[in-house]
């Protein structure tokens, strides 16, 4: 069992099959590979169904879970790239023009501030801290317009072949 001390802004990568929990008082954005399965091994007395047998069978002991080691030569906005998703974090003071590939929608989450997502042929969508907007592949281009300073995370599928990120226990 490993305990990872976290601070605001830390990026933790948890590989599938890693038993993990989120400590009290934490607020997080959880991005995961596409899956319809969650095995609950403990539920803090909430009374939801547990999945002990299936959960134990799915555990991987060779987990690469830990704090993501940021690559110094890469994109400064990129928090993590994995074979299943990528996560970027940006502080916006000016509008951001973005395009969506045919392979991946974008999920834009406001971490601080508020903004509007605009695209030709659709109504503008306002969003603020803690809210997310899914930009589907049918929208080829969009603009994120901050109403004041806006900090966002943007999730999408990675492009090209991507290895597991480097991590460290902290």
Model-derived segments and their meaning:
Residues 1-47:
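Contiguous mid-protein beta-loop-alpha structural module that forms a pocket-lining wall or clamp
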